[in-house]
Amino acid sequence: FSEAGDKILVADWFWAPYNTIAREIGRSVETFELFDDKRKFNIKNFSAKADSLLEKQERLVIILNTPAHNPTGYALSDEDWRNVVNYFSSVSKEKKITLLADIAYIDFAGDEEKYRSFLPIIEEAPENVLVVIAHSLSKAYTLYGMRCGAMICMAKTEEIAAEFKR
């Protein structure tokens, strides 16, 4: 979903092993400022950093750790998610974006309905965006050390699903 030498976009508050994982597969991590000066999701910086990377590379992997972002506890609001999807709609269709929503801590976020309401919103992402949901049983079911989880692909076409399976 990316090429050797590409940068992966993550928030500036992130799980440090992303650096090691990226380096081991020939990528590197680029960060955007998670919060603006009002302590809200910084869509402007997110968009600017994504635009900058897409000027240099054909594909972009974006990791958003939400809800119950580790380490801040922050959760993108439905409005934040709409802004992210709207940003994706503004990007050239020739560019390929993979959005990895790391929802490892979703079961610790609180109100189930509230913190799952983003799912129908990200279904609206355009076809050039592959949405992948990463869930961890080690967190949700306290199976620490088991390293058991799932990746769910929200593909709009059979071709995209086939690419995900490879």
Which residues does each PLM region occupy?
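Active-site phosphate-binding strand-loop segment of PLP-dependent enzymes
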Residues: 36-114, 119
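Short beta-strand->loop structural element characteristic of the AMP-binding/adenylate-forming
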Residues: 28-38
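Substrate-binding/gating loop at the entrance of the active-site cleft, primarily
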Residues: 10-28
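Hydrophobic residues in well-ordered beta-strands that form the structural core
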Residues: 10, 31, 99-101
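A short helix->loop->beta-strand "cap" motif at the edges of active sites that frequently abuts
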Residues: 6, 27, 92-97, 129
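Conserved core segment of the aminotransferase class I/II
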Residues: 122-166
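Phosphate-binding glycine-rich loop
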Residues: 1-7
